[in-house]
UniProtKB/Swiss-Prot annotation:
Belongs to the peptidase T1B family. HslV subfamily. It comes from Helicobacter pylori (strain J99 / ATCC 700824). Pfam families: Proteasome (PF00227). The active site is at 5. Allosterically activated by HslU binding. InterPro entries: ATP-dep_Prtase_HsIV_su (IPR022281), Ntn_hydrolases_N (IPR029055), Proteasome_sua/b (IPR001353), Proteasome_suB-type (IPR023333). This is ATP-dependent protease subunit HslV. GO terms for molecular function: metal ion binding; threonine-type endopeptidase activity. Its EC number is 3.4.25.2.
Length: 180
């Protein structure tokens, strides 16, 4: 259940305009059975200034969302400070260290992966990040499309997630996308 989804975050500049998008599939899997095909695993936070998405246990992810949103509010939307404080708080709490979820959070300037161990990882290129069972498929597709095609950002996210959905049995092509 920990990896059974695909979430893709993408930020940058297109035609001299900054963008930030997050997309995810809608499949919820319990063991080897699909129990829902249209779940929403992405959210807009802090007055639509930060995007987030999760992979993993739904109950754990909602706990993480709530905690991260509280910290983000206290830091007045400063994403960098929020992820650092989030990681510190996560590592101090025995309960949180056992949560089986990962998150991507991003804005116009940063893309971070928050791991199940409390680690904060900035995307290698600070542009594209993916998590979940189809994450590597989506990440590879997004990097290739970003490098070789001049696609609108929304189309790039959609096509990358479709490729992941075609290859990963825990990911479907019922795609939801949010953008700043």
């Amino acid at each position: 259940m920990f990896e059974a989804t695909t979430i893709l975050g993408y930020r940058g500049e297109f035609d001299n305009k900054k963008f930030a998008l997050i997309g995810g599939d809608g499949q919820v899997t319990l063991g080897n059975c699909v129990v829902k095909a249209n779940a929403i695993k992405i959210r807009s936070l802090y007055h639509n200034q930060v995007l987030s998405g999760f992979a993993g246990s739904t109950a754990d992810a909602f706990s993480l969302f709530d905690m991260f949103e509280r910290i983000l509010e206290s830091k007045k939307g400063d994403l960098f400070k929020s992820v650092v404080d989030f990681s510190k708080e996560w590592r101090k709490d025995k309960y949180l260290r056992r949560l089986e979820a990962m998150m991507i959070v991003l804005n116009f300037d940063h893309v971070f992966i928050l791991s199940g161990t409390g680690d904060v990882l900035e995307a290698e290129d600070n542009k594209i990040a993916a998590i979940g069972s189809g994450g590597n498929f989506a990440l590879s597709a997004a990097r290739a499309l970003d490098h070789f095609a001049h696609l609108e950002p929304r189309k790039l996210v959609e096509e990358s997630l479709k490729i992941a959905g075609d290859l990963c049995i825990y990911t479907n092509t019922n795609i939801k996308i949010l953008e700043l």
